[in-house]
């Protein structure tokens, strides 16, 4: 997985690949620097030279814009990356009486490290609201959920309430179940029984 490259070299290589795929010819050195916020053209030159030496790029020194991706090496590395990830369904609406991963519920997929699947079937749900902010789960976050229908006290779960999914901490008492928000301004939900859709095992957040 590009073990022999620095993060900057990977960034440059991927930019060149995208540029060629889109425009049909390679970018100029200055375009690479401008697009990747590299102020020094010599830094770009040095990294391109190293990519050539490591077999990822080929360049004709007598021609301008003569960078060429060596596809066999690039594709081999990309395939290795793909083997290490798996596309996980992103669930949109949740409907009562319908399996959580029914095709009608799935809006898209998102690649996650394959290790997540060793914990069972997983799906992603986008958080709406601020009921779990004190656990660091914010509005708009994507939570990674392991599909299961049971929970232990204190688990953060996705539960089905009034035909929609809610994210809360689960507590079973002698005569009721408490779904507790992690927001001191909100009250817990008290119910006799509830359908557990899964346990939250991770979180993904986009930083703009």
From Swiss-Prot:
Pfam families: LexA_DNA_bind, Peptidase_S24. The active site is at residues 131, 168. Disulfide bonds: none annotated. It comes from the Bacteria. The keyword DNA repair applies. Its EC number is 3.4.21.88. Residues 29-49 bind DNA. It catalyses: Hydrolysis of Ala-|-Gly bond in repressor LexA. The record marks 96-97 as: Cleavage. Keywords: Autocatalytic cleavage, DNA damage, DNA repair, DNA replication, DNA-binding, Hydrolase, Repressor, SOS response, Transcription, Transcription regulation. Represses a number of genes involved in the response to DNA damage (SOS response), including recA and lexA. In the presence of single-stranded DNA, RecA interacts with LexA causing an autocatalytic cleavage which disrupts the DNA-binding part of LexA, leading to derepression of the SOS regulon and eventually DNA repair. This is LexA repressor. It comes from Finegoldia magna (strain ATCC 29328 / DSM 20472 / WAL 2508) (Peptostreptococcus magnus).
């Amino acid at each position: 997985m590009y073990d022999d490259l620095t993060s900057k070299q990977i960034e440059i290589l991927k930019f060149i690949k995208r540029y060629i795929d889109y425009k049909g010819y390679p970018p100029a050195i200055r375009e690479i620097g401008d697009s990747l916020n590299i102020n020094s053209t010599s830094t770009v030159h040095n990294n391109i030279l190293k990519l050539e030496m490591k077999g990822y790029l080929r360049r004709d020194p007598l021609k301008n814009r003569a960078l060429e991706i060596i596809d066999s090496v690039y594709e081999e590395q990309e395939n290795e990356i793909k083997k290490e990830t798996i596309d996980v369904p992103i669930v949109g609406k949740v409907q009562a009486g319908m399996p959580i991963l029914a095709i009608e519920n799935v809006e898209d997929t998102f690649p996650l490290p394959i290790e997540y699947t060793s914990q069972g079937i997983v799906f992603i749900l986008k958080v709406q609201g601020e009921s779990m902010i004190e656990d660091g789960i914010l509005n708009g976050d994507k939570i990674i959920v392991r599909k299961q229908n049971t929970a232990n006290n204190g688990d953060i779960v996705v539960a089905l309430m009034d035909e929609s999914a809610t994210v809360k901490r689960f507590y079973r008492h002698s005569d009721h179940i408490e779904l507790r928000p992690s927001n001191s301004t909100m009250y817990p939900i008290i119910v006799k029984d509830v359908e557990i859709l899964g346990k939250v095992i991770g979180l993904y957040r986009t930083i703009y």
